[in-house]
Amino acid sequence: MTKHLPTISDISPLLKAEILAEALPYIRSYHGKTIVIKYGGNAMVEERLKESFARDVILLKLVGMNPVVVHGGGPQIDEALKKIGKTGTFIQGMRVTDEETMEVVEWVLGGEVQQDIVMLINHFGGQAVGLTGKDGGLIRAKKMLVANEKQPGGTIDLGFVGEIEAINPAVVKALQDDAFIPVISPIGFSEEGQAYNINADLVAGKMAEILHAEKLVMMTNIPGVMDKNGTLLTDLTAREIDGLFADGTISGGMLPKISSALDAAKSGVNSVHIIDGRIEHSLLLEILTEQAFGTMIRSR
């Protein structure tokens, strides 16, 4: 049986009022600060969650924060690949990307998915602008090679999977200054103009670092980081994370997510959280309430 996840309708009027009152100190604290949000998973698929996310981002902007959205699109890419008879292959949480897959990734992320997010935010009264790594030289990338765990010293070529060489934040800052909400697709480009598929978690983490973000929030399809017994780990340090990597608790798609979150924390991002994007208005609950939510990542 599918577990019921709460919606805004489940919250009593009194609790709603208490939440609004509770939000004031957080609004003051984050006023004028950059909040980077990695948006992905079910929150990008279910209509009610898509709408609640758009409204949340708009509210953050209206109360004086500077939200920057970095989106994924794994399910949409998988669906597009399925239509042309291809299946996704992942190594260490990274999608192996041949030339044909790269074309699909560019079309899905830079077109279909991004346009949907931008249009929804604009529909509800916000001002969103979509960007890829090519716009304003935002994300310069190079080919990523990952370590071959079965062959010490060896590497694995993932195709057109990229790692970030540099980020030019000028275009993002210009949009923020003009009251726009940047929506960034995780596609980078080399100096020669070659497009690369970059894991969205890595882009979000590096964007938070370069923009000197106050907060990085990563939305997932689970309550946060779980131990091997399925218990939520609400607070993790670098040392604890190393242990979870070593014993295999953190694996697959969580590898780049946790690595990126930890790197952001080490780089000076004051608050890094991994939260359950399946809960309606989870973004506001994380940023504007006292309630512990998801997993907080700390550098020490």
From Swiss-Prot:
CDD domains: AAK_NAGK-C (cd04250). One of its GO terms (molecular function) is acetylglutamate kinase activity. The keyword Nucleotide-binding applies. Keywords: Amino-acid biosynthesis, Arginine biosynthesis, ATP-binding, Cytoplasm, Kinase, Nucleotide-binding, Transferase. Its main location: cytoplasm. Its EC number is 2.7.2.8. Substrate binds at residues 73-74, 95, 197. Pathway: Amino-acid biosynthesis; L-arginine biosynthesis; N(2)-acetyl-L-ornithine from L-glutamate: step 2/4. Gene3D superfamilies: Acetylglutamate kinase-like (3.40.1160.10). GO terms for biological process: arginine biosynthetic process via ornithine; L-arginine biosynthetic process. The record marks 38, 257 as: Transition state stabilizer. It catalyses: N-acetyl-L-glutamate + ATP = N-acetyl-L-glutamyl 5-phosphate + ADP. It holds the Pfam family AA_kinase. HAMAP family: ArgB. Catalyzes the ATP-dependent phosphorylation of N-acetyl-L-glutamate. Belongs to the acetylglutamate kinase family. ArgB subfamily. This is Acetylglutamate kinase. It comes from Polynucleobacter necessarius subsp. necessarius (strain STIR1).
